[in-house]
Structure formats: C-alpha cells, structure tokens
Amino acid sequence: MPKKFQGENSKSATARARKAEAKAVADARKQKELEDALWEDNDKRVVKKEQRKDDKERKRLEALERKRENQRLLEEEDSKIKGKQTKEGPSKVTRAQIEETLQSKQNVKEIKEKEKSHLDVPLEENVNRIVPEEGTVEARTIEDAIAVLSTKEDLDRHPERRMKAAYTAFEEANMPRVKMENPNMRLSQLKQQLKKEWTKSPENPLNQRAASYNTK
C-alpha cells in the first residue's frame, strides 16, 4: 500500500491553523466591538442621566437664588417704607402737639379774660342791690352819680372814687348797643370796646371835671 504525502498534510494543517487563528481574531474583534458598543451605550445613558440630574439641581439652585433675591428686594423695600414713615412720623406728631398746645393756651387765655372781666366789672351784677359802704352815697343811675359828684364839693375833687359806680351804670346802659353792633365779639372784647368809649364819654366824671375846669 503506497504511503501518503506528508508535506501536503503539513500545509493543510497550517492553513487550517491560520484560518482558525484568523477566525479567532475576527471573533475577538467582533466581541470587542460588541462590548465597546455596549459600554458606549451605557456611557450615553449614564451621561444623559447625569445631565438630567445636573439640570434638575441647576434649576433648583436657580429657583432658590430667585427666591432669595425676591426676599432681599422685599426686605429692602420694606426698610425704605419704614424709614420714610419714621422720618414723617415725628413731624406730624409735632404739628399735632403744637396745634394742641396753642389751642390749650388759647382756651386758658379766654378763661382768664372772662374771669378777669367778671372780677373787675361784673356785668350781671345788679347795682340796685349793692349795699352802700359806710360814708358813701348810693347812686343807682348815671344821673344820680353825676348829681352826687356835682353836689359834693369835697368829693368832686376826687371823682375817681366814684368811677366804678358811674362806669357800671354806663356799661349796663350801653352793652346791648355794643353787642348789637358787634355780634361776633366775645364778652372781653365788648368790655374793651366800652372802656374805650368810656374814656371819651361825657358821662365820665373825669371828663366832666376837665370840662368844668376848662370853662372856668
């Protein structure tokens, strides 16, 4: 039986070995590509997930920053309003206090004037009920006062001693007229007006004395 050719078998084995090696390399390359693709896909998912997480955190921080900024602006505006009110407050209070003080002073002044006018020359006092002092002559009217002053030589030298009775009669006689002429005047102002008229009135004993002196 003839022998087989050994060299041919060696070449065939080498070819098969090379083929197997090439296949193994190709399979390894393919496997690597598959693994790389898998890792790449996983990386993309991770990156997207991280990006979404980062975006969410960024939006949260931005919202928090806007909230803080709005709070700061609100506090700043509130502080300005309070500061403005603090500056205006004392001024209003001061004006109110000044007006109240002036009104109080005016009221006190009017009360004092009324008390003084009533004490000096009581308008409501009825001279007909005044009890004459000892050593004096009672005069119920202006004519009586003038008659007393004119008939008493010693008293005529000092007519000011009978001024009060004469003025009281003058005031009672002329107060209604002055009130009618000056309806808006207070009692103290009416009395001042009468006093001015009294200084020039011929019914004033002092004026009568001066007139009598001038005729001599």
Curated annotation (Swiss-Prot):
Residues 1-93, 194-216 are annotated as: Disordered. Its main location: cytoplasm. One of its GO terms (biological process) is transcription by RNA polymerase II. GO terms for cellular component: centrosome; cytoplasm; midbody; nucleus. Associates with translationally inactive ribosomes in the nonrotated state. This is Coiled-coil domain-containing protein 124. GO terms for molecular function: transcription coactivator activity. It holds the Pfam family Ccdc124. The gene is ccdc124. InterPro entries: Ccdc124/Oxs1, Ccdc124/Oxs1_C. PANTHER family: COILED-COIL DOMAIN-CONTAINING PROTEIN 124. It comes from Danio rerio (Zebrafish). Ribosome-binding protein involved in ribosome hibernation: associates with translationally inactive ribosomes and stabilizes the nonrotated conformation of the 80S ribosome, thereby promoting ribosome preservation and storage. Residues 201-216 have a biased composition (Polar residues). Residues 18-119 form a coiled coil. Keywords: Coiled coil, Cytoplasm, Cytoskeleton. The keyword Cytoplasm applies.
